[in-house]
Amino acid sequence: MTEQRILMAGDGDYSALDQYFDSIGSRKVLLVCGGSIRFQKINGYFLTLEERKGIKVVRFSDYAPNPLYESVVKGVKVLHETGCDTVVAVGGGSAMDVAKCIKLYSNMDDTVNYLKQEIVPNDIPFIAVP
């Protein structure tokens, strides 16, 4: 399986992101972000996403700098319990690391330590907004 990689750039114009969400059929996104998102323009984008596009947003920020494995496990649980179909990371390295691991572990057996399992590719879309 080869993942499709798309690079979007812009300064506060998120129309390409809207188009991408439409193209992949997102209905509910897991937004992995730290507290600093509230100071960023993109916060307004996600606050209005459901109203504008009908895409629900579930925020996950239950992790610390230099996140622990247990934080990722919590994130995978939130992804499964809420039925999110897309993972979005906004912020710095910790948000990116946690979100990438949530995507990576999302289709693994949650009764066994993820680090002891074979990595199995999955089709869950992943979007990174550094």
Located regions from the model:
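ATP/NTP phosphate-donor binding region
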Residues: M1-T86
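Glycine/threonine-rich beta-strand-loop-alpha-helix active-site module
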Residues: E70-P130
